[in-house]
C-alpha cells in the first residue's frame, strides 16, 4: 500500500510539472483574457481571430459579453484590459510592440492568419495607433476594425479624472491615425448621447461605416445588438477566404 501511494504521488508530481511549464506564454505579462472557440464547425477555422481592447473600466460587462458572442460565431478572442495595461503610461510605439507580440503568439496558437481589432471607448481611441505602427508582415494580417464610442483623443494612460467625465482633450488625437487606415473596413459605432465623439468626423472616409445606437455609452447593454452590428459591418472581412499570408514568424 505504501509503495503504491508513493508511486501515485510521484506520478502526480511528474504530471504537474509539464502543466505548469506549458501554461507560461510569451505574453503572460499582459494579463490577457482569452475566449477560444469551442465550435467544431470546420468553416470556423477560416474566420479571423479578434483582439478586443477594453474600455478604461477594464475587462467589464460589455467587453466580455460582446467577445463571448463573437467566440460563439467561430472567432477566438484575445481580451486586452486597458485598465490594467494603461494604468501606467505607454507610448503608442510600446502599445504597437505589445500588440505585435499578441499577434505573433496567438496567430500561431489558434492557427489564424487574419485578425480583427475591436475597441470600446478608451480601447477604441488607442488601437488605431497600433495598426499604423505595425511592421508590414503583421499589418497585412489586420483585415478590419470596430471602434465603439471613441472620443477624439487619448492620453495612453488611465486617469481617475477620466472617470469623472472631465472634458480635457488627450495628448494623442485619434482622427489623424484613423485617416491613415484606408485599406480595411472600419465600423464606428456611437451613441446619440455622446459628446466629443470621433465617429461623425469620419463621415467622409469611404472605408468607415458609421452606425448610431441609442442607450448612452454602453448602448443600453444591448450586447447582442452590438455584436450584430459588428458582424454586419465587417462581414466581408470576416467571411473572406484566408489569404496566402501565413501567420507571421
PLM regions with names:
Residues 21-45:
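N-terminal cap/lid segment of alpha/beta-hydrolase-fold proteins
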Residues 8-18:
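Bacterial N-terminal signal peptides
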Residues 223-249:
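Catalytic active-site module of serine/aspartate enzymes centered on a nucleophile-bearing elbow/loop
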Residues 78, 204-219:
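Catalytic histidine neighborhood in serine/cysteine hydrolases
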Residues 38-75, 79-82:
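Short, surface-exposed "cap/lid" segments of acyl-processing enzymes
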Residues 41, 156-206:
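The feature captures the conserved acid-bearing segment of alpha/beta-hydrolase catalytic domains
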Residues 105-106, 114-169, 177:
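Primarily recognizes the serine-hydrolase "nucleophile elbow" in alpha/beta-hydrolase
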Residues 89-110, 129:
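Alpha/beta-hydrolase active-site loop
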Amino acid at each position: 500500500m505504501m509503495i503504491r501511494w508513493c508511486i501515485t504521488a510521484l506520478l502526480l508530481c511528474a504530471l504537474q510539472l509539464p502543466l505548469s511549464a506549458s501554461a507560461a506564454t510569451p505574453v503572460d505579462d499582459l494579463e490577457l483574457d482569452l475566449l477560444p472557440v469551442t465550435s467544431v464547425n470546420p468553416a470556423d477555422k477560416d474566420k479571423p481571430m479578434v483582439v478586443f481592447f477594453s474600455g478604461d473600466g477594464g475587462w467589464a460587462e460589455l467587453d466580455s459579453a460582446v467577445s463571448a458572442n463573437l467566440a460563439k460565431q467561430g472567432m477566438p478572442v484575445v481580451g486586452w484590459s486597458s485598465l490594467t495595461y494603461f494604468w501606467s503610461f505607454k507610448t503608442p510605439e510600446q502599445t504597437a510592440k505589445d500588440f505585435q507580440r499578441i499577434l505573433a503568439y496567438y496567430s500561431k496558437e489558434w492557427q489564424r492568419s487574419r485578425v480583427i481589432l475591436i475597441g470600446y471607448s478608451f480601447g477604441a481611441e488607442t488601437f488605431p495607433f497600433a495598426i499604423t505602427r505595425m511592421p508590414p508582415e503583421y499589418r497585412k494580417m489586420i483585415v478590419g476594425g470596430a471602434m465603439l464610442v471613441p472620443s477624439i483623443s487619448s492620453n495612453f494612460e488611465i486617469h481617475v479624472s477620466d472617470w469623472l467625465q472631465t472634458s480635457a482633450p488627450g495628448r494623442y488625437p485619434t482622427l489623424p491615425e484613423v485617416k491613415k487606415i484606408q485599406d480595411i473596413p472600419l465600423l464606428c459605432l456611437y451613441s446619440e448621447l455622446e459628446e466629443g465623439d470621433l465617429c461623425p468626423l469620419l463621415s467622409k472616409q469611404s472605408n468607415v461605416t458609421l452606425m448610431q445606437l441609442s442607450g448612452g455609452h454602453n448602448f443600453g447593454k444591448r450586447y447582442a445588438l452590438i455584436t450584430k452590428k459588428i458582424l454586419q459591418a465587417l462581414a466581408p472581412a470576416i467571411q473572406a477566404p484566408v489569404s496566402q499570408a501565413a501567420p507571421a514568424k
